[in-house]
From Swiss-Prot:
Database matches in InterPro entries: Ribosomal_uL13, Ribosomal_uL13_bac-type, Ribosomal_uL13_CS, Ribosomal_uL13_sf
Gene: rplM
The protein's assembly and partners: Part of the 50S ribosomal subunit.
Protein name: Large ribosomal subunit protein uL13
Gene3D superfamilies listed in its UniProt record: Ribosomal protein L13
One Pfam short name: Ribosomal_L13
PANTHER family listed in its UniProt record: LARGE RIBOSOMAL SUBUNIT PROTEIN UL13M, RIBOSOMAL PROTEIN L13
Key words of the record: Ribonucleoprotein, Ribosomal protein
A single Gene Ontology CC term: cytosolic large ribosomal subunit
UniProt GO molecular function: mRNA binding; structural constituent of ribosome
NCBIfam families, A to Z: rplM_bact
HAMAP family referenced in this protein's UniProt entry, alphabetically: Ribosomal_uL13
Similarity comment: family membership: Belongs to the universal ribosomal protein uL13 family.
Entry function: This protein is one of the early assembly proteins of the 50S ribosomal subunit, although it is not seen to bind rRNA by itself. It is important during the early stages of 50S assembly.
Length: 149
């Protein structure tokens, strides 16, 4: 005779979680593979107490974002759209022109698209720092090096 009254689901509270800082070197790595590794860390899916509706993930620092690779012909053919919110205000950029203007933007756009939409996704995106080269101001944090494929 089993009674199921004593079984309780335990939820981890974000205030008890110590956030770590991970650094990913993006030089000569594929953009999508870097983005998926970063999102996994940001969401906290690498932890045993992952909860989809809470910010239990860690902070991610990506360096050398300007040296990221693309597969196929995406360097010339991938198009990024943005809108000014005025009639006829649709603008488009190829990967080449966008990365020349702002080298961190393609990686940030890829990661933002993989995060949940809404307040939680915006909160998780604030835990991401992307730098175009190896120089960054976060060396005072205890950074753990993460190897991505």
């Amino acid at each position: 005779m089993n009674k199921m009254t004593n079984n309780k689901t335990i939820w981890m509270k974000p205030r008890y979680v110590k956030k770590k800082w991970y650094v990913i070197d993006a030089s000569d790595k594929v953009l999508g593979r870097i983005a998926t590794e970063a999102v996994k860390i940001l969401r906290g899916k690498h932890k045993p107490y992952y909860t989809p509706h809470q910010d239990l993930g860690d902070n991610v620092v990506i360096i050398n974002a300007s040296k990221v690779k693309l597969t196929g012909k995406k360097y010339f053919q991938k198009i990024y759209y943005r809108h000014s919110r005025y009639p006829g205000g649709l603008y488009s950029d190829t990967y080449r022109t966008l990365s020349e203007r702002k080298p961190t933007a393609p990686l940030e756009i890829a990661i933002k698209g993989m995060l949940p939409k809404g307040p939680l996704g915006r909160e998780l995106f604030r835990n991401l720092k992307v730098f175009a080269d190896a120089n960054h101001k976060l060396s005072s944090q205890n950074l753990y090096k993460l190897e991505a494929n």
